[in-house]
Structures are given as structure tokens and as C-alpha cells.
Amino acid sequence: LELKPGLQGFFDDWSSDQRAFKGVPWGKAMMWIFLVSDTFIFGCFLASYMTVRMSTLEPWPSPSEVFALSFGGAPIPLILIAIMTFVLITSSGTMALAVNYGYRKNKWVTFWLLFATAVLGATFVGMQVFEWSKLIFEEGVRPWGNPMGAAQFGSVFFMVTGFHGFHVSIGVIFLFIFSYKVAMGHLDDQTPGWFTKRGGNYEEIEILGLYWHFVDLVWVFIFAFFYLW
């Protein structure tokens, strides 16, 4: 069987030992593959949300009323959500600086930046827990219905924000783990360890940064779709 030159090259590459991501470390390649797959999941969730919202015949709850907090007796629309967004975007900045100083092998600056990112992420999760508790216990919103309008609001809101909050929580755990590892010098010497088997390499911080920036980017879309639309 004689193959055309293009097909022959394809099969030669497929059968050889060449990696699909030439020159890209396996950890970074695997993270990119994971993020692409996660993008499809979040994309399906947001597409489902748009479909449900545009097809329902019941009035959709107004975000400026549902997510308002009262200060001095006056409700301020979306104030908590604005603070949450600011906290998460700030954490993206500290994460980027942590990657930068990590490659410079400035251990303690990297540690404090990772630790600050973890604290900001934990703060975001805490505020999300407060948001959920307010909706559930004060407003009576449930996954199967709510007293403010369309019954589907609760199910899609808790599903999408809960899935994102789970991602943030996982990221916070790993941020604390790697803060400890950086402080202990596990990335500077040849100390074998979990996710840090290659001594003298801060590549793991960059991989963690890819995940964290993805989580922040997803929140921007959630913020636009759920709170501004």
C-alpha cells in the first residue's frame, strides 16, 4: 500500500517516539489538556444556563435584587460579588508574580506570594459560602425552586457556582501545599516529593499558575452571565 507523502509523514510521526507536544514538559502539557477539557464542561454549563433562561416563561430573578446587601438600611446591588471578583483578580496578579519570582529562585518572595494567593482564594470561597447561606436561609432559594421567579434559577446557579467553587477550593489546597514546599526548599534541592520530584525546578509553580489563571478567567464569564445579564 503506497501512501501519499502527507499521510506517510503522519503515520511516521504516530509510530515514532516523538511527543505530541515537542519541547513542552509533560506536566505542562497534561495541565493544558485538562484545562481544554474543563473549558468544554464550563462551556456546556453556561450554554445550558442561557438556554434555560431564554426558554423559561417565568420571570427571571433580577441579579441586582437577589445579590444585594444592606448597609445602614440601604441595599447595595452586587457589592459582595464585586468584592469577590476583586479578590479573585488580585489573586491572579499575586500568582503571576509568584511564577516570576519562582523562576528567579527567590524562595521567600515566592513563598509569600503563593501564601497570599492561597489566602485570597480562601477568602473568595468564604464569601461564596456566605452568599450561598444568605440565598438558602434568608431568601429561600433551593436547587428545585425559589420564591423570586423561575424555578430553574436555583439549580443552574448552584450547579455552576458550586462547580467553580470546587475548583477554587482544590486550587487553594494546592497553593498551601506548594507554599510549604517552597518554604522547605523542596524545589531548590534534590529532595524527592509529591509533584516536586525534579530538584531545582520551579516549573510546578507555573503549572499551578496555569490552573489558577483558568479558574479566574472562568469566574469572569460566570460574573458576566449570572450577575450582569
Model-identified regions with their sequence ranges:
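...captures the hydrophobic TM-helix bundle architecture rather than a specific catalytic motif
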Residues: 1-229
